[in-house]
From Swiss-Prot:
It comes from Vibrio parahaemolyticus serotype O3:K6 (strain RIMD 2210633). This is Ion-translocating oxidoreductase complex subunit A. Pfam families: Rnf-Nqr. Its main location: membrane. The gene is rnfA. The chain crosses the membrane at residues 5-25, 39-59, 67-87, 102-122, 134-154, 171-191. The lineage of its organism: Bacteria, Pseudomonadati, Pseudomonadota, Gammaproteobacteria, Vibrionales.
Amino acid sequence: MTEYVLLLVGTVLVNNFVLVKFLGLCPFMGVSKKLETAIGMGLATTFVLTLASVCAYLVESYILRPLGIEYLRTMSFILVIAVVVQFTEMVVHKTSPTLYRLLGIFLPLITTNCAVLGVALLNINENHNFIESIIYGFGAAVGFSLVLILFASMRERIAAADVPVPFKGASIAMITAGLMSLAFMGFTGLVK
């Protein structure tokens, strides 16, 4: 049980996919201008990442490895992710049309989010079992959502602040992301 908690804490805080592994930077910078959009994207990504991790583990364990076709891993994981994203898009469209409009093009772009494919591939490379795959996918998703929501909150405050002209826009966003990354480095010794 302790190793599961450590895996969860490690993926959320210590080995955060955005700030440490630099995966998922496109939605991190693109969707983080408004807090409500960031929360919606975080929830959608959490659902997709967790479900894609489980599906990727099952595809690897019950199809690719038994048939000896591991060389099709990346292509099959992309297909699995696309199916999960389409399912998520249908669910969001039916349950929250407002959120669906707010997310716009970013919802289908979860398919190309490198964090989703990265988590699926790292699950296999680190030889996680079924439970560990669920925890790893969920932890990565929670870490992504946490960073996305924190960054969106900061960007909303920065938008209202008096920022010097040369630092407006992407410049101050990158500086803020760097400072967030430094803050998360404080968790480095938490899990070995």
